Regions:
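N-terminal secretory targeting modules
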Residues: 1-63
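Catalytic nucleophile-elbow at a beta strand-turn-alpha helix junction centered on a G-D-S/GDSL motif
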Residues: 58-74, 90-92
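Structural recognition of the beta-strand scaffold that forms the well-ordered cores
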Residues: 61-63, 85-88, 111-115, 155-160, ...
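Oxyanion-hole/transition-state-stabilizing segment in secreted/luminal serine hydrolases
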Residues: 70-83, 94-138, 146, 157, ...
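Residue-level preference for long, well-ordered alpha-helices that form the structural scaffold
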Residues: 93, 129-136, 181-192
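A general structural detector for well-ordered alpha-helical segments in enzyme core domains, enriched
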Residues: 100, 136-147, 188-199
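Substrate-gating cap/lid alpha-helix
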Residues: 166-210
Length: 212
């Protein structure tokens, strides 16, 4: 009887510790993400709340990234699957993903498909020399490295950044989204292309080329 009691107690304690640990997997609302504007912060923490309510779970495939990933909705319907989890956040930066990797590391998914980086170039980076292809690519690879270090069995795939439609970009600017550059510069696509070239030469992770 005593042995059974001790066994039940141990399992109860392990369960409590596991639940306690889970509460620390997500960035809190006071987390500062460099360059994040108010609308982005709102979207970011709304999604974080959703993630808390619907954890990744075990043996999953995670689609991690920005609005392109989020916009896919339930990716399971598209791929006739039942184990894909959407972890896209509209307007997110590489810095935002770096702040929310604990959940990925904890659940150790089978694979992660990563698409991020375009929002850095959308933002007005004329006075932010750190926002350049080299550093954006460096952050993307850093995300992959952190996942691999703490979850070595997780296979990480990196999507190349998609270019923008110049005409559509100008139309969107007219709506006065503050996160877009004040002075339109057609160099966004050249920065995207350069970033993709760096990623494709990384030698550590498979790169899925969505646009050569």
């Amino acid at each position: 009887m005593s042995t059974q009691f001790n066994s039940n107690l141990i399992w109860t304690l392990l369960f409590i510790l596991s639940c306690s640990k889970n509460t620390n997997l997500y960035p809190d609302p006071n987390t500062i993400i460099k360059g994040q504007q108010e609308w982005q912060k709102k979207f970011y923490f709304e999604r974080i709340s959703e993630f808390k309510n619907e954890p990744i779970g075990k043996n999953k495939i995670v689609f991690l990234g920005n609005s392109i990933m989020q916009g896919g909705g339930n990716w399971n319907n598209r791929y006739k699957s039942d184990n894909i989890v959407n972890r896209g956040i509209s307007g997110d930066y590489t810095a935002g993903i770096l702040k929310r990797l604990d959940e990925i590391i904890f659940y150790k998914p089978n694979s992660v498909f990563l698409m991020i980086g375009i929002n850095e170039f959308f933002a007005d980076n004329s006075e932010k020399p750190e926002v350049n292809p080299e550093n954006v690519a460096k952050n993307i690879l850093k995300i992959a490295d952190i996942i691999t270090k703490h979850s070595p069995k997780t296979k990480v795939f990196i999507h190349t950044i998609l270019p923008i439609n110049n005409d559509q970009y100008i139309k969107i600017k007219e709506v006065n989204y503050n996160f877009l550059q004040d002075n339109y510069r057609p160099s966004i696509n050249s920065q995207v292309k350069e970033t993709n070239s760096i990623l494709e030469l990384n030698g550590r992770y498979e790169v899925i080329d969505l646009h050569s």
